[in-house]
UniProtKB/Swiss-Prot annotation:
Expressed in olfactory epithelium and embryos. The keyword Cytoplasm does not apply. It holds the Pfam family GSHPx. CDD domains: GSH_Peroxidase. The active site is at 73. Keywords: Oxidoreductase, Peroxidase, Secreted, Selenocysteine, Signal. It catalyses: 2 glutathione + H2O2 = glutathione disulfide + 2 H2O. It comes from Homo sapiens. This is Glutathione peroxidase 6. One of its GO terms (biological process) is response to oxidative stress.
Amino acid sequence: MFQQFQASCLVLFFLVGFAQQTLKPQNRKVDCNKGVTGTIYEYGALTLNGEEYIQFKQFAGKHVLFVNVAAYUGLAAQYPELNALQEELKNFGVIVLAFPCNQFGKQEPGTNSEILLGLKYVCPGSGFVPSFQLFEKGDVNGEKEQKVFTFLKNSCPPTSDLLGSSSQLFWEPMKVHDIRWNFEKFLVGPDGVPVMHWFHQAPVSTVKSDILEYLKQFNTH
């Protein structure tokens, strides 16, 4: 399976880079709703190897970045950038959590046991190993979506008015607050309440700048 995707990765990265040049800045980030009821601490998820169920309440007091990911997406170039973000912001209490999903273009086709191998040898390849926590592959939209994503989506406006081509979207029913594509991001504050939501093509450098600006209110050094 890995050989099947390897040749296409560089092409995908090139196309995504071109698309980002035309992305309107005002669409890159939205602030989440005020007066949200509930927190992420009511939820949890199984790690990628299925050996541990992590309750998100263990991240109380931290700033948590939720990302839905896919190894064979053109945006997989964000993986090493997310590694760098995790390393650079960990002393600020920022934690990255990644959730593989196959609902957008069928770009995460592997089993849980194959995902890390795909990241290491194919996309992004070059021996890549994530420094942040990955969870089991699952849905972020539709009838079987993970409950934490139901909460995140209900807490924040969508980043775009358009859902995209239905031929590349694999869930039902479709709703206005659904995640649009791989690598959308939600920042949750130290009280467990969502703060910001980024469009999937927003550069990780922009996400980092937005987070650093947000952290100023906490006088974090």
